[in-house]
Amino acid sequence: MEYFKNVPQIKYEGPKSNNPYAFKFYNPDEIIDGKPLKEHLRFSVAYWHTFTANGTDPFGAPTMQRPWDHFTDPMDIAKARVEAAFELFEKLDVPFFCFHDRDIAPEGETLRETNKNLDTIVAMIKDYLKTSKTKVLWGTANLFSNPRFVHGAATSCNADVFAYAAAQVKKALEITKELGGQNYVFWGGREGYETLLNTDMELELDNLARFLHMAVEYAQEIGFEGQFLIEPKPKEPTKHQYDFDAASVHAFLKKYDLDKYFKLNIEANHATLAGHDFQHELRYARINNILGSIDANMGDMLLGWDTDQYPTDIRMTTLAMYEVIKMGGFNKGGLNFDAKVRRASFEPEDLFLGHIAGMDAFAKGFKVAYKLVKDGVFDRFIEERYKSYREGIGAEIVSGKANFKTLEEYALNNPKIENKSGKQELLESILNQYLFSE
């Protein structure tokens, strides 16, 4: 069955094209710095937003019109979604997809029944993977939707829930390995608290670390060689989540001796909710060698929740890809579109239009960022700005030779301090030149 009959194969037609079903800036085979653009960007489709989201919000009923809606049996719906997914993957020519365990198969009455459902759908996906160019970027477990996780999963006050969550992640790791997933993600949507009045924060954090160590041990036991990733988010659905931002997660990993096993999956809209620029989170992760992958989306700056919009801001995508290029590119990670069409964009074709918009925006952003890095635009200015640390007293500070006594002596004998302008306006103007030069 063809699910998207009105959508042709999406091809690159260039920036002058008026075809809505064509890429304007993303030419997957364009060679930049010795490899195709598709290998630089490593695009991925998010199974949950694309195939399971129905448009429900706190104020209204589902709006999405999907070709598989006529099925009533949950397993029939799951099978139809797999068929539709690989049709979309093929028409977009996207190299990867990501999934939660509960995205691909429905939950049963018992854990055994749920695992049986998963096995059925995983076998179906494996058959498609044999002939598809699309592979699995990462898998994960949904430890937040079911009411059993009302108090958390690994941080639940109920040990029975901790055990169930462990069993669920065990299975999710197995199927991610079985499907050839290159990464495995942990996102703690319920790992946090609503009030400290009823919370043993120390025990919860210790238990979260115990849980993650168990995951590492089991992954090693089954031979899963994918990269473990943690996705920071400060709030929503929980008031205060323990994986607040990149720095919070980094401190947690360091404290519990997990930093050698984990990197971060940074999401743009989560950075917004934490009060950071997307680039800030990427920069922090990059300079600490923990940037693993990216959830590509954007938020609405006027709203205080996770809107998960398709990323269309070229300035944002440029600065994001600047950090990726400075890192040396992705290893096992990629750009996963953790984005959903708006509730009023309910037609099946909108799924393609959203991905095309995001893929074009990141392709354009990559090309601009590559020029910025190659031309050393910001590097030269930053090098000049901090040159005082390459000579004299600055060099002594950096080398560790200076101390408070020697610095006091220097300050007493150097009463005149001369600062120079930070030239922010100039640099922003130069960035605009690069953004709009083509």
Swiss-Prot record:
Catalyzed reactions: alpha-D-xylose = alpha-D-xylulofuranose
PROSITE patterns for this protein: XYLOSE_ISOMERASE
Catalytic residues of the enzyme: 100, 103
Residue pairs linked by disulfide bridges in the UniProt entry: none
Stored InterPro entries: Xyl_isomerase-like_sf (IPR036237), Xyl_isomerase-like_TIM-brl (IPR013022), Xylose_isom_bac (IPR013452), Xylose_isomerase (IPR001998)
Pfam families assigned to the protein according to its UniProt record, in alphabetical order: AP_endonuc_2
Enzyme class name: isomerase
Keywords (A to Z) from UniProt: Carbohydrate metabolism, Cytoplasm, Isomerase, Magnesium, Metal-binding, Xylose metabolism
Residues holding Mg(2+) 1: 231, 267, 295, 338
This enzyme's EC code(s): 5.3.1.5
Compartment(s): Cytoplasm
A GO BP annotation: D-xylose metabolic process
Superkingdom in the source lineage: Bacteria
Required co-factors: Mg(2+)
Family membership: Belongs to the xylose isomerase family.
Protein name: Xylose isomerase
Organismal lineage: Bacteria, Bacillati, Bacillota, Clostridia, Thermoanaerobacterales
Gene encoding the protein: xylA
